[in-house]
Amino acid sequence: MDRKKWCSGLVWALEFTLVFCVVTTVRAKNNSEKSASAGAASPLAGLGSISGTVKAPKEFKAAKVYVKNVDKNVVYMVFTEGGRYQAVDLFPGNYEVSVTKNGFTDSDVQKITIASGGTATADFTLKEGTYRPNQQMRSGLPKGEPLVSYDELYPPGHARETIERTCIMCHGPDFLPNKQWDESQWNAGIDLMQNPNDNAGARLVPGTFAAGEREELVAYLVKNFGPDSKKRGLAVPDEPIDEKALGKAMFIEYHIPPLPKGDRGFHDAHLSQNGDIWYVDARGLQVGKMDPRTATWTDYPVAGPQYRGHGLTQDASGDIWMAGHTAFVRVDSKTGEIKYYPYDTEAKRPPHGNTPFVDSKQNIWESLSWANEIAKWDRTTGEVSLYKTPTDNSFAYGMVMDKNDKVWLADWWRCKVTKFDPVDSQWIEYAPLTRPCTMRRVFADHNGMIWYALEWPGKIGMLDPNTNKIVEYALPLKWSFPYDIQQDHDLNYWIADSGQGGALIKFDQKSKNFTYYPYVQRTDMPKIEVSSENSIWYTTRSADPKDQALGVLYPDKSKIQTLAGSY
């Protein structure tokens, strides 16, 4: 099956303090000769490499080595294997190199220069430091807040059960403990979640609370997270480490230049026909492209906040289509000219476009989250048609089209997989095996199986549309929070997870094995894209605005043939 058709759019508190010191030696060699100590020069013309050793007074696995090109603001990250590391395909220029590993002090930052085609060596010796438990990745969390066990953070009881099926499913475990609200504020928050007139609709529908449950909930929140409480977070398990797999891998993050005014804030990215990576800067009201071969950026501002974007796709002619807040947004990829096609000029609230896809006839389809609809822009007529989803307040989020042009939706709030047949306008809803739940995205694999990711309770599932059979797989760590799932060309499945502070996870369906690749920085990844060479592209949505980046994971850096990204 042609991937371009179906991918077109696509932190127990344990702390101990020890004496620390870092001794680092750096030896730089700027030449193009192959060296056993420095590693082979990059196979890509004009690019360089760096390698070295990391030592410590006690055993460790998979330390993170950061190699930052300060000229282009590009960060490479690799993991040690047996105390050695290598980063390849580095742009020529000035670099800062450092090492981090939880339980050890961070190394000094070492400055080196890599010439075109050159190699360098940097060796590090770490000393013991402080171990900090892991924490889920959520925007706005204070850095370094105390982390405690679940029962300490949320004392057991019926009110906790209510929180689990309402608040935590979407917000995660660290949202409530960081509020310190009084009774009136907690009641106002619940009122907002129940307000049917809010732009996004009611998150908590009538019937969510049985008699007395809301009052019980508010009393619990005031007692545990009231004005006199302290900000705290949940200590979650560390990711399992497969050092052999991590030793092969390399991340690259391309950091976007700041705007003259205002903050950056990525949402989705999309690979393109010519290898550029297109992106949505939702906070900065931009759509744009980045050439990973040169790390150059081009922004195209949209006409206003009413066109703020979410997802992207590309049609056969090369035009980029963005799901805007109130309209289809069409960008000429060559000239940057932008056109807008409103979803519904009479809509009482913004429809909030989410995920776009192109069908076999080059019609553009989108999920409209706040309107609980899907929209179609007809290639022949230019007209826009709207189709209402069968369940109110479903919040149609991720969307995919299969090889037969059937539309598949992930209903975030009502947690269903919903199918729409454009031929007869018929809908079919499929409930996951595990409920209650929340679901962000769906994916159609090469066999037509529909995969979904359940943020809560941390599972992935597969629906066979031919038999209606559903199989689910629990992620191995509690408090996993899978967002998206995609398939690579070796038939592995890749999961974007923010549960342990952020990781990409490879799932082998045959062996049922999960391999974790911890992120470069703390973030979530709302959408991942797999290239024709099995590189995994993402955005750093919930990272600090100053650290917004387009990122890519190469599971095997020895197989990199190009820095470009196409399907």
What are the functions of these language-model segments?
Residues 260-274, 305-317, 346-361, 392-404, ...:
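Beta-rich, blade/repeat-based domains predominating
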Residues 102-122, 127:
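Structured interaction patches on ligand/partner-binding surfaces of diverse proteins
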Residues 93-103:
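A short, solvent-exposed beta-strand micro-motif common in secreted/extracellular proteins
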Residues 277-283, 320-326, 364-370, 407-413, ...:
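Conserved beta-strand positions in repeat-built beta-propeller and related beta-rich domains
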Residues 48-50, 56-71, 92, 144:
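Short, ordered, surface-exposed loop/turn motifs in non-cytosolic proteins
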Residues 69-84, 88:
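Short, acidic Ser/Thr/Gly-rich low-complexity loop/linker segments typical of extracellular
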Residues 163-174, 217:
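The canonical Cys-X-X-Cys-His
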Residues 525-567:
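Blade-level signature of beta-propeller repeat domains, shared across WD40, Kelch, NHL, RCC1
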